Amino acid sequence: MEESVGSRGGSGGGGLDAQIEQLMECRPLSETEVKTLCEKAKEILMEESNVQPVKSPVTICGDIHGQFHDLVELFRIGGKCPDTNYLFMGDYVDRGYYSVETVTLLVALKVRYPQRITILRGNHESRQITQVYGFYDECLRKYGSANVWKIFTDLFDYFPLTALVESEIFCLHGGLSPSIDNLDSVRSLDRVQEVPHEGPMCDLLWSDPDDRCGWGISPRGAGYTFGQDISEQFNHSNNLKLVARAHQLVMEGYNWAHEQKVVTIFSAPNYCYRCGNMASILEVDDCRNHTFIQFEPAPRRGEPDVTRRTPDYFL
């Protein structure tokens, strides 16, 4: 008989640890195990806010997109969870070849160490998008049915939309919204739904910073572009130092915008296995100093192992 997480000790127990170990070897869980795991995750995520408070020190990460081996590399460089406190800003699935293993591992870590990892929703944590960009097909291929896809996409509805590190770094997948000028407006949204095609929840997951001032029409067909004037006003009104977001490929792994009011963090190196970009993660320490750690794809055997650390003392 196949044992579930629950029958092997629950979220504190060895059963989950064994599953995490299995996932770290890129071996998927059974459908039954995924179902039990996601039921536990839902209970935890239901209690979290649309603006989930996070304490420093914390390591902030951008898109992963099913690049499982690069996620393992990220943990090697940034430190294991729970030794390191992590905040992931969405887009765990699609495009890469290991969306199933990637999202299952992150959800398992969330259930095992709920206070040490925060997982936000990205625009790809959606039923519609995953049917086009790979996660749906991957679930079908690996499990023989769409059940696991349905279990995960139902869970995605509960992922928090944003996080707030030490009341001064606002973290979210996409960007700002013309419908939202303060954090209480975010807190009051009903997030338990498929990502809408328009409106504030859509914007938070789809918008991008832009060189042009004001609000602009997004070339993505969802969300908006927003200028430095918008970022400055938003940060000022909400007593924020910084908006940290993901959602856009940046060649160095991170990119400042709007005179260091906004930073983009992208954590999938050599994106889609062909873009040649670096990835990065942002470490915020106890004193709220910021260090970007850049990394390259997980080394294949015989290749050099290179990491570049870039301290950043802008505060």
From Swiss-Prot:
Kindly list the GO molecular function terms attached to this UniProt entry: metal ion binding; protein serine/threonine phosphatase activity
**Keywords, alphabetical:** Cytoplasm, Hydrolase, Manganese, Metal-binding, Protein phosphatase
Q: Which cofactor does it need?
A: Mn(2+)
The active site consists of 124
Pfam families recorded for this chain? Metallophos (PF00149)
Kindly state which reaction or reactions the protein catalyses: O-phospho-L-seryl-[protein] + H2O = L-seryl-[protein] + phosphate; O-phospho-L-threonyl-[protein] + H2O = L-threonyl-[protein] + phosphate
In terms of InterPro entries, this protein maps to: Calcineurin-like_PHP_ApaH (IPR004843), Metallo-depent_PP-like (IPR029052), PPA2-like (IPR047129), Ser/Thr-sp_prot-phosphatase (IPR006186)
Entry's Gene Ontology cellular component terms: cytoplasm
The residues that the entry says bind Mn(2+) 2 are 91, 123, 173, 247
Residues annotated as binding Mn(2+) 1 are 63, 65, 91
Q: What is this protein called?
A: Putative serine/threonine-protein phosphatase PP2A-4 catalytic subunit
Q: Which gene encodes it?
A: PP2A4
